[in-house]
């Protein structure tokens, strides 16, 4: 499941990954 379209900050991706579990 990769419904994240954020390519500005890697931090956002890490936070999203943490949210997914």
From Swiss-Prot:
Induction: In stationary phase (at protein level). It comes from the Bacteria. This seems to be an N-terminal remnant of a longer hydrolase gene that can be found in some other Escherichia and Shigella strains. This is Protein YmjD.
